[in-house]
């Protein structure tokens, strides 16, 4: 029976970007499928009872995180450029549209490349439209979904279900009753899937 990796991510997360760099190949090697599940990290933290400051507000922590991000990007041989803003909600919602069109992997990969590889401004709707078009999605339909009450409702429902499941950050990968948090847990995930 094919196992499913529930991949909880937020385009605001550079560590989710790094996980997405490796996750599709990992899934193919292990015969799994990925279910892409966008969340909102600040909202997830609060839902889990974490009311502390964001990582960007803790100066010693952000210095270490920045160094780690550079190391991971070099290890994975991918570009890493901080985006012009962290307003990624529309992109998260758009991932649900892409999932409904069986284009989640392509869209998420292309979106992460734009946001964290190139460093675009996620607030720029032309970037969102361009990303949709690059992977063969109808940009008008995607943007309409993102703006619609139905699309926003689907995104809200997806987030609520994630938090009820215990999602408190990203990236998080769930398989069976196992949880793997962070791109640095991909080896553990692969070992579990191969056992």
From Swiss-Prot:
Top-level taxon of origin: Bacteria
A GO BP entry: naphthalene catabolic process
Cofactor binding annotation: Glutathione seems to stabilize the enzyme, which loses activity rapidly in the absence of this compound.
Transmembrane segment boundaries: none
EC number annotated for this UniProt entry: 5.99.1.4
Activity regulation, free text: Activated by salicylate.
Known catalytic reactions: 2-hydroxychromene-2-carboxylate = (3E)-4-(2-hydroxyphenyl)-2-oxobut-3-enoate
Binding site for glutathione: 13, 181-184
Active site: 13
Signal peptide: none
UniProt binding sites for substrate: 45, 55-56
Gene3D superfamilies: Glutaredoxin
InterPro entries associated with the record: DSBA-like_thioredoxin_dom, GST_Kappa/NadH, HCCAis_GSTk, NahD-like, Thioredoxin-like_sf
Pfam families in alphabetical order: DSBA
Keywords: Aromatic hydrocarbons catabolism, Isomerase
GO molecular function terms attached to this record: 2-hydroxychromene-2-carboxylate isomerase activity; glutathione peroxidase activity; glutathione transferase activity
SUPFAM superfamilies linked: Thioredoxin-like
Assigned protein family: Belongs to the GST superfamily. NadH family.
PANTHER family, per the entry: GLUTATHIONE S-TRANSFERASE KAPPA, GLUTATHIONE S-TRANSFERASE KAPPA 1
The protein's name in its UniProt record: 2-hydroxychromene-2-carboxylate isomerase
Organism: Sphingobium xenophagum
